[in-house]
Amino acid sequence: MAKKHTVSETNETISAVITALGEGAVGIIRISGTEAAAIGDKLFRSASGKKLTEHTPHLLVYGHVVDEENSKIDEVLAVYMQGPHSYTAEDVVEIQSHGGLQSLKTILGLTYKMGARPAEPGEFTKRAFLNGRIDLIQAEAVMDIIKSRSEASLKMAVRQQDGQLSKKIKGLRRNLLDIVVNLEAVIDYPEEDIEEITFNTVSEGMEKVKQELEYLLKHAHTGKILREGLQTVIVGRPNVGKSSLLNALLSEERAIVSEYAGTTRDVIEEQLLLGSVPLVLVDTAGIRQTEDYVEKIGVARSKERLDKAELAVVVLDGSQPLNEEDEEILNAVAGKPCVIIVNKGCLLYTSDA
């Protein structure tokens, strides 16, 4: 059997299905830890008759999963990855079986019988972090890649996983340490004529650090939008066409549309990808003065979501002049990124004045 490789704090071997649960063509089970190689050799029978660990690591091998009685469970491909050259930096075995729930459940159950325990959510990535294969920023990037909703967010997450952000932060740390060294030199050797030179060096160094931090903060906000979506709130007084706009953007009848004012009484939230930018699109109750208790709650929620909005889409009724409710809404979005849409253009209101 192959030599065991692991640097984890625990000697426990873990296993789990790492593909999405549900019926599919292929499902993958990952086993990681000190006993992964031994479990792989017990579980897998290659077409050549050789043990899995006797094959070249990192190459897929064709064969079958077998149970304790040597009965075939499923036709699979298996791969052995010797630590530390694996995702977790431990010995890892991955089995690619048919994606049926029963097949995956049976194979996973066999790994438990052979000494593995169920992996906790995120535990493979946790082990990769604890074993030093990735840092915390790269670990967070793994989930960002999985949850990417656009090509732009995927590219950003891949750059983060490659360590580009980590390198920038390490560079900042080096610059700050250089500044500390210069300051300590002035303190430790006050008799030396280096104070002016050191002051200039420290000043230039701090300015460089400041510029780099401003750059990172600017792009952090962009990254947050790409990961979580731009909070976009559609607002307006009742019956101006907010719900119709939401339905048109989503290309489906998501919100009830009626000729009667006040149809929307609660917040409706949906996801929309606009080009490469994900939006969290929020349709709100029409903002107006009302005595209806339920509608009052809806109006209060509308104002609350508007306060938190990163982009406001204000819908105005082009068939009527601006009124106090319109002006209240326009005042509320002052200073906030805003798009103003004049609806009902075919009935455009014109003043006689």
Regions found by a protein language model. Give the residues of each.
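Substrate-gripping "pore-loop 1 plus following alpha2 helix"
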Residues: 293-301
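A glycine-rich (often HGG/GG-containing) alpha/beta subdomain
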Residues: 1-155, 159, 163, 339
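Flexible nucleotide-interacting loop at or near the entrance of a catalytic core
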Residues: 151-235
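Conserved Switch II/interswitch segment of TRAFAC-class P-loop GTPases
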Residues: 309-323, 347
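Short, conserved loop/helix-junction motifs that constitute active-site signature segments
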Residues: 331-335
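Conserved G1/Walker A P-loop phosphate-binding module
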Residues: 215-291
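Conserved small/polar residues in nucleotide/adenosyl-binding loops
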Residues: 349-353
